[in-house]
Amino acid sequence: MQVFSLWLETFLFHSRIEDLIDQCYEHQPPDTGVMHDIWDSPAKQSLGPFTTTKNNFTFSFFIDWFNLFTNKISDKTVSCGAIMIFCLNFPYYLQYQPENTYFAGITPPPYEPSVITITALLDPIVKQLQYFYHGQVIHTY
């Protein structure tokens, strides 16, 4: 498993990182009501001041299961899952780029994990994230 704190230090050590992150705090949702990304969402706004306070980061935790062989229903199905974390403080067009993605782990094939298995896979990841809950100082570029 990739260590989140080391990935975060590397992620934040880019020459334009502060300018890119500042863009999210300057973002104003459009008056049209059309949502283009998470920053336009009423649900995001309902999370309170933590997500809108400068230098606080918001991450998206994502698991995507896929068939290793194909997506055809008639063929053999072997399910595997990628566990990823994205920084939502980046402009939308950069959030999901591979270089900005923390690859947290993978669920083992051939079946989707049970509740017990997924808990065992996610617990170490959550423990790494808990370290940052009350804030940590990480130097940028």
Named regions from a protein language model:
Residues 1-141:
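Domain-level cores of phosphate- or acyl-group-handling catalytic modules
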